[in-house]
């Protein structure tokens, strides 16, 4: 349940929605399994993995889960069967099979094999904090986050969001190393990516490296800027913070993840609820801290 990545978005307009409102809207787009001739389907499912509720509320945050099912039909399987059919037809007719005919044959093979193909399920989690004008998606790639937002926008009708950081904060991240201006609640770890500002410039990726070393200082003096940097924040989690404010490899500390261990293991729903309330509150607190640290403009229409 603990998020592994963060894509942070600012709501430019207040969303006046209750848990019941969101439930009703998501219920119009529920997940359903792939039909026999469908490559993929997508829809909303229970965040806690049981029951009919498509939204879980805790501490004023609404937890949502998008489920995708795909049929796994390897291209190699299709192409191998296509090659056999083309070879057989050419042997029988003595002439080459044209591209159009091959495409039609390929589509016929896909339609025949699809119902037999295995399916794979994947899940995208996120939450809305209307009181904080914040939307958070657990995604490492922009495409996955944008799909989540697009499906949410389709369901609720309007989702006026912009990235938390509208422009790169690479200069500020670089100053953390060049000017020793690291915020008090941030600890710099031993991983970073530095990039030259020149077109097709050099990229330096370092791991298990003292970022205060002379070697790193030389790269910075040569004009490279920080694109990604590993941090620990306020004894709450470690992560890789990017210049666009995306957060990857998020790992909450044991102190955090063990806070609710007093809840009986058999009461899984209560444990999930408590963990989500704790995690989402810390993510909101972190996002507010990012706004302060980088002086991000949070316009409201």
From Swiss-Prot:
Cellular location(s): Cytoplasm, Nucleoid
Transmembrane segments: none
Pfam entry (one): RdgC
Entry GO terms, CC: bacterial nucleoid; cytoplasm
Listed GO MF terms: double-stranded DNA binding
Gene Ontology BP annotations: DNA recombination; regulation of DNA recombination
PANTHER family recorded: RECOMBINATION-ASSOCIATED PROTEIN RDGC
NCBIfam families: PRK00321.1-3, PRK00321.1-5
Family: Belongs to the RdgC family.
Protein's name in the database: Recombination-associated protein RdgC
Taxonomic source organism: Pseudoalteromonas atlantica (strain T6c / ATCC BAA-1087)
């Amino acid at each position: 349940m603990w998020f592994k990545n963060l894509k942070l978005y600012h709501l430019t307009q207040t969303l006046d929605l209750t848990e019941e409102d969101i439930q009703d809207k998501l219920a119009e787009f529920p997940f359903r399994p792939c039909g026999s001739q469908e490559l993929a389907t997508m829809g909303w499912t229970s965040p806690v993995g049981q029951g009919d509720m498509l939204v879980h509320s805790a501490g004023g945050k609404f937890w949502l889960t998008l489920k995708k099912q795909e049929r796994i039909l390897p291209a190699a399987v299709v192409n191998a069967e296509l090659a056999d059919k083309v070879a057989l037809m050419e042997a029988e007719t003595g002439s080459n099979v044209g591209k159009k005919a091959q495409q039609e044959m390929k589509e016929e093979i896909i339609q025949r094999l699809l119902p037999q193909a295995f399916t794979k399920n994947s899940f995208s989690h996120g939450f809305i904090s209307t009181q904080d004008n914040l939307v958070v998606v657990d995604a490492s790639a922009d495409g996955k986050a944008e799909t989540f937002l697009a499906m949410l926008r389709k369901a609720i009708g309007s989702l006026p969001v912009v990235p938390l950081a509208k422009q790169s904060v690479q200069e500020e991240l670089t100053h953390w190393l060049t000017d020793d201006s690291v915020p008090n609640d941030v600890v710099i770890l031993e991983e970073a990516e530095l990039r030259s500002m020149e077109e097709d410039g050099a990229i330096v990726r370092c791991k298990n490296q003292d970022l205060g070393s002379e070697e790193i200082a030389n790269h910075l003096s040569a004009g490279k800027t920080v694109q990604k940097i590993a941090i620990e924040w306020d004894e709450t989690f470690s992560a890789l913070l990017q210049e666009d404010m995306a957060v990857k490899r998020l790992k909450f500390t044991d102190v955090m993840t063990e806070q609710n261990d007093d809840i009986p293991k058999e009461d899984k729903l209560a444990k999930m609820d408590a963990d989500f309330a704790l995690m989402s509150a810390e993510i909101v607190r972190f996002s507010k801290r990012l706004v302060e640290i980088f002086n991000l403009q949070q316009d409201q229409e």
